[in-house]
């Protein structure tokens, strides 16, 4: 499928490795992955939703099986570049009444796409979101600017080493070490040059002001113990999106779609209106 846009004529399906699964004619859910991952990290939730929903999965450019030739470091130094890609998918496949589920940094991409074109979206689910990782005044994102600079310096100087050390911290499921191994493998499959740009975009973005632009029913899903998105961040997001709901999973880590797929899928399905 080809479409016009700021990137010129592009094959949207190939660019983002778009895949459609689940029940034709069911409510449509788009599952968007976060930094260093690809759509495969949704597989456990996908299996639990596929009998009731039509599912749209994809890889961000620079990740998974996306088209390497589509990579543009200037475009993707802003979350808006990723958000524009998502809107391109939505328009190319003429998706309407869409339930968008964004994990981690993709949650803020969801905020941007819904703010840009709310007519296409019925609901928004933000899974372990953070609008800003860096502390600012009374806002507590969980990290100082120095923390983030050190994290990015480590990533840029030794990406593979960073991946092996950070994956267990991000996954936060010490009783399931195989999940940290999987996340490490996912990080290591990502081109380091792309990962460096995506990491800076992820950890240096500040989307707090964009939360007020969301005008569709929104569910915020947080974990009880999450190093990257602590409880006060989930509360902040819920308080700054008018009418939104907050669900706290009795789970540890930043990736409950892997570590707690049952309750994650249940929360998404209940909000999305499975019958």
Outline where the language-model segments fall.
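Conserved alpha/beta-hydrolase catalytic His-Asp/Glu region
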Residues: 135, 139-143, 154-212
